[in-house]
From Swiss-Prot:
IleRS has two distinct active sites: one for aminoacylation and one for editing. The misactivated valine is translocated from the active site to the editing site, which sterically excludes the correctly activated isoleucine. The single editing site contains two valyl binding pockets, one specific for each substrate (Val-AMP or Val-tRNA(Ile)). It comes from Streptomyces coelicolor (strain ATCC BAA-471 / A3(2) / M145). Pfam families: Anticodon_1, DUF5915, tRNA-synt_1. It is an enzyme of class 6 (ligase). The lineage of its organism: Bacteria, Bacillati, Actinomycetota, Actinomycetes, Kitasatosporales. Keywords: Aminoacyl-tRNA synthetase, ATP-binding, Cytoplasm, Ligase, Metal-binding, Nucleotide-binding, Protein biosynthesis, Zinc. Disulfide bonds: none annotated. Its EC number is 6.1.1.5. This is Isoleucine--tRNA ligase. ATP binds at residue 603.
Length: 1047
């Protein structure tokens, strides 16, 4: 029976090529399907996929969210859960319509209706599936496991029926209403927008800021003074209806000697500037109520009396003049105030944003372009007090970037304000990552919640399922089956989109009414579609009832931070409206992806990174690791080739090199795991330390991923892989050469566990390692790492004391290396001894001592106390920065005490922990960071100290030490020659050498056994080589020439 063996692992790895091979393996072996089948019956861990719209090509930012949406389902699957991963597509909405309009060369709704709604919607349907292949390619290439074969689509009839059902539920609760309100309106798209859409489209603009005189025509100041009103929207002055004043604010009359103006007292200087003084007259806003004034423009007719001062509590004295122009057709607060006074609502602006043609001066002009003409007219008539350009943030359409106007119109609203308290309660139950979003960005959003403007005057969307008769009786339909019953005709195959749904009528369902009911013309906000996906993806409640109920709410969702006002909000709002419970429990908010130069990625700047080429250059694992662990996931991050290459170099290649090292020496020595391998307790201290660190790592990484902290998990893994390679493997290299079973078994166990821990983050490289190092030598091993179980940390196997001691060992090694470098004595040159002074040195075992002596290449270690203070001259002085925080003004007194103290005694005390000095009769305790100790080595010694630790190297070289150093130089040269000759690490060699320097001859002669062992020479002799040996290698420094051949 042959011994099982690792597969051969190449020293160099091509990550993209490796990943394509792994993709083939997953596909051929149906690994994703097996992971779902294997976990059937386990507890559900529910994840919701936020649906993208596939009417455009995917970008680098699509990778980011997909990384997190893959990491945690993989992690939870390995932890023993069943994690369904249904993919989805967002199909409806204004972005889709605008893209199709652009393709067809349309300029607005009139072109769509001339073309035909059915034909236009057919184009939209085709558009949203145009790039699904590209999205699926991205999803597959990056290793994001999702069910792409059975996705939900928001345009499918069953999905729409579920949405209808939910709207009927909301209507029956009295929360879906039609109202005439001022709401954001896009004149280009001809539709209203919801508050969360509005939040996504602010742009910085410069508008005219005008201060306008409104001459008073009644009250005590009639004919002699004017109100001064400030606005940044001069175009709304055409329909000015009133001026609002706060009832409790004092308004003063000011004069410059020529005219009198009325402004709020706190804003006198700010609004009017220098040269204005009060006349002594003042009035409260309440006293000014119903004073009439001359309106700024008489371009439109008013059906009822208007144009007087009204009182409003929302008026402030922070900006402007304290007097606010009211135009109720274009302002929500204005509408409320004017309604309370019974004032008319006059709207001279058409839905396309242009003034009615019969409006003098600005007829047919787009509202924003009317500002200039109107301002000039005010100035000509002497009503313009001053005009200042004003830079501010103004709402624009989040898709077409047209300036919005607030527009009074009838729309359908969901009364989310009625469930505000429930939303806040659900938010309290939700875990946000980062936590600051909970009561910050998202909490503020909920606290300022306004009713959801649901309806859209558009075409490609879920039709609002409300039918109305001429008597305004409303019937809300929840399914096509219900529509069949109401209409008396079979609607089971009906496409529920416009215009087909518009053709369905029925007799009003209101008892006693026989009028025809016709569907209202609007469609709904596409954000409601995506917010309904938890139940609509299953066609609930008409099918999959138990399935949905077992998968609501989600344990986890993740998208970019801007979704706090998008999908995160609509998911919570719809869930709470319909089920009185939020749709999710944990949400990870991701920062935006920027170009390497810190700017936003855009075609215009030419700094877009295409996702597939990016992964084919660096590897998907490298991109995934960067996204998950290359910085705070919730902060904006710069992505570029350089940053990703650093990830590959620092972590992934180090991991791979360690795996290749293990495979090489296990195959070379014929080792495979067996029961004959030493038990952990019987292995050397370095093995025991590594296994202790491994269990600690497992515990810490598990905790980090449980807390959705991929950055911390990545840092832990990266640091461990670095320690594994640059400390454990390097320190144990000779043991691996010798086929040491304890070392090989230890590294095997560590690689297997680390591979599992890294698998959710880097699924490709870990799969390859699993196939190469685990499956071949482990009977019954799962065929994929992604079918394996998450490792369990054995907390009893963690040795905190050993960990602490190894930290000390490595600290002393670093100090020793530093002082060697400073002395100029190379590491290959053996030294006789190192003296150590540090707290805890006496607790180190002989095994740990040997780690230090071998690393520092010294023959022995001893405590510095054995030779007293003769090695260094010691000085001590105060660290003012550290002491100043504690002692403030007394720091000078403490500094003098430190300077007067015995510096050597202070140094010794600080190594043990703390030191003390007398200051004005008081004993003051000092910490190591509060005193700067300087130790100057005496001749023949090299000394380094840091934070209470000192390493002193004896630099005196005997002839024996010099010869040993030369022997090590020769070993290095021969190892390089072996490598350059193309020999395998296990190949034995014969070597012939000659030298002219007596020191070199003596060194190679005295240390021939050591050299032979190190370079695997079975025949090592001085003398000329025959022609069977290779070309000569020469080193002038050693005056050495040698030739070698494979045995």
């Amino acid at each position: 029976m042959t011994t099982p063996q690792y597969r051969q692992v190449p020293a160099q790895v091509d990550l993209p090529a490796l990943e394509h091979a792994v993709l083939d393996f997953w596909r051929e072996q149906k690994i994703f399907a097996k992971s779902l089948e294997q976990s059937e019956g386990r507890p559900e861990w529910v994840f919701y996929e936020g649906p993208p719209t596939a009417n455009g090509m995917p970008g680098a930012h699509h990778i980011e969210a997909r990384v997190f949406k893959d990491v945690f389902p993989r992690f939870r699957t390995m932890r023993g859960y069943h994690v369904g991963r249904k993919a989805g597509w967002d199909c409806h909405g204004l972005p889709v319509e605008l893209a199709v309009e652009k393709e067809l060369g349309f300029s607005g709704k009139q072109d769509i209706e001339a073309y035909g709604i059915a034909e236009f919607n057919a184009k939209c349907r085709e558009s949203v599936t145009r790039h699904t292949d590209a999205f699926e390619e991205l999803t597959t290439r990056m290793g994001y496991w999702a069910d792409l074969q059975d996705p939900y689509r928001t345009m499918d009839p069953e999905y729409i029926e579920s949405v209808w059902w939910s709207l009927k539920e909301i209507f029956n609760k009295g929360l879906l209403v039609q109202d005439h309100r001022v709401a954001p309106w896009c004149p280009r798209c001809g539709t209203g927008l919801s508050d969360h859409e509005l939040a996504q489209g602010y742009e910085t603009v410069v508008d005219p800021s005008v201060y306008v005189r409104f001459p008073l025509t009644s009250g005590p100041l009639a004919g002699e003074a004017a109100l001064v009103v400030w606005t940044t929207t001069p175009w709304t002055l055409v329909s000015n209806t009133a001026v609002a004043a706060h009832p409790d604010v004092t308004y003063v009359v000011a004069t410059d000697g020529e005219e009198k103006l009325v402004v709020a007292e706190p804003l006198l200087a700010k609004a009017l500037g220098e040269g204005w003084e009060t006349t002594g007259q003042s009035f409260t806003g309440a006293e000014m109520e119903r004073w009439t004034y001359q309106r700024p423009f008489e371009l439109v007719e008013f059906p009822e009396p208007a144009h007087y001062v009204v009182n409003a509590d929302y008026v402030t004295t922070e900006d402007g003049t304290g007097l606010v122009h009211q135009s109720p057709a274009f302002g929500e607060d204005d509408l409320k105030v004017c309604r309370a006074y019974g004032l008319p609502v006059v709207n001279p602006v058409r839905p396309d944003g242009t003034f009615e043609e019969d409006v003098p001066l600005v007829g047919g002009v787009f509202f924003k372009k009317a500002d200039e003409k109107l301002t000039e007219d005010l100035e000509t008539r002497g009503l313009l007090f001053k005009h200042i350009p004003y830079e501010h943030s103004y709402p624009h359409c989040w898709r077409c970037h047209t300036a919005l106007l607030y527009y009074a119109q009838p729309s359908w609203y969901i009364r989310t304000t009625a469930i505000k308290d429930r939303l806040l309660q659900e938010n309290e139950k939700t875990n946000w990552f980062p936590d600051a979003v909970k009561h910050g960005r998202y909490g503020d959003w909920l606290n300022n919640n306004i009713d959801w403007a649901l309806s859209r005057n558009r075409y490609w969307g879920t039709p609002l399922p409300i039918w109305r008769c001429a008597e305004d009786h409303l019937t809300v339909v929840g399914s096509r089956a219900e529509l069949t019953e109401l209409s008396g005709t079979d609607q089971s195959s009906l496409d529920p989109h416009r215009p087909f749904i518009d053709d369905v009528t029925f007799t009003c369902a209101q008892e006693g009414c026989s009028l025809e009911a016709v569907r209202v013309p609007e469609v709904i906000d596409a954000w409601y579609d995506s917010g309904s996906m938890p139940f609509a993806q299953w066609g609930y409640p008409y099918k999959n009832k138990e399935l949905f109920e077992s998968r609501y709410p989600a344990q986890f969702i993740s998208e970019a931070i801007d979704q706090t006002r998008g999908w995160f909000y609509t998911l919570m709002a719809v869930g709470t409206l319909v089920f009185d419970k939020s749709s999710y429990e944990n949400v990870v908010c991701l920062g935006h992806i920027l170009a390497e130069d810190g700017r936003k990625m855009s075609k215009h700047l030419g700094n877009i990174l295409q996702p597939i080429p990016l992964m084919d250059q660096h590897g998907a694992d490298a991109v995934r690791w960067f996204m998950a662990a290359g910085g705070s996931p919730w902060a904006a991050r710069r992505v570029g080739h350089g940053t990703i290459q650093e990830v590959v170099r620092k972590t992934l290649l180090t991991y791979w090199n360690t795996v290749a090292f293990q495979a090489l020496y296990a195959r070379t020595t014929g080792w495979a795991p067996s029961e004959a391998d030493p038990a952990p307790a019987d292995r050397p201290v370095l093995d025991r330390w590594l296994l202790s660190e491994l269990h600690a790592l497992t515990d810490q990484v598990t905790q980090a991923l449980d807390a959705y902290d991929t950055q911390r998990a990545g840092k832990l893994l990266s640091a461990f892989v670095d320690d594994l390679s640059n400390w454990y493997v390097r320190r144990s290299r000779r043991r691996f050469w010798q086929g040491d079973k304890a070392a090989l078994r230890t590294l095997h166990e560590v690689v297997e566990t680390v591979t599992k821990l890294m698998a959710p983050l880097t699924p490709f490289i870990t799969e390859r390692v699993w196939q190469d190092l685990v499956v071949p030598v482990t009977p019954g091993a799962p065929e994929s790492v992604h079918l394996s179980s998450w490792p369990e940390a054995d907390l009893t196997a963690i040795d905190p004391e050993l960990s602490k001691q190894m930290v000390l060992v490595r600290r002393l090694v670093e100090l020793g290396r530093a002082t060697r470098a400073e002395s100029g004595v190379k590491t290959r040159q053996p030294l006789s001894r190192a003296l150590i002074a540090v707290a805890g040195f006496d607790t180190l075992s002989p095994e740990l001592h040997s780690q230090i002596t071998e690393e520092l290449n010294v023959a022995s270690l001893a405590s510095l106390s054995e030779v007293g203070g003769s090695l260094v001259d010691t000085t001590a002085k105060a660290n003012f920065r550290a002491l100043g925080k504690r002692f403030g003004k007394r720091v000078q007194d403490v500094a003098k005490a430190v300077a007067a103290a015995d510096a050597a005694a202070l140094s010794l005390a600080l190594r043990e922990g703390t030191a003390s000095v007398e200051v004005d009769g008081e004993t003051v305790t000092l910490a190591p960071d509060e005193v700067i100790i300087t130790e100057t080595p005496r001749e023949g010694w090299s000394v380094a100290s840091d934070s209470g630790a000192t390493v002193a190297l004896d630099l005196e070289l005997t002839e024996e030490l010099r010869r040993a150093g030369l022997a090590r130089d020769a070993i290095r040269l021969i190892q390089e020659a072996r490598k350059n000759s193309g020999l395998d690490v296990a190949d034995r060699i014969a070597l012939r050498w000659t030298a002219t320097d007596p020191a070199t001859i003596a060194a190679l002669t005295d240390h021939s056994g050591l050299i032979s062992d190190e370079v695997l020479a079975t025949d090592f002799a001085q003398g000329e080589a025959d022609d069977s040996y290779g070309a000569p290698f020469t080193d002038e420094g050693l005056s050495l020439v040698f030739r070698l051949r494979k045995q």
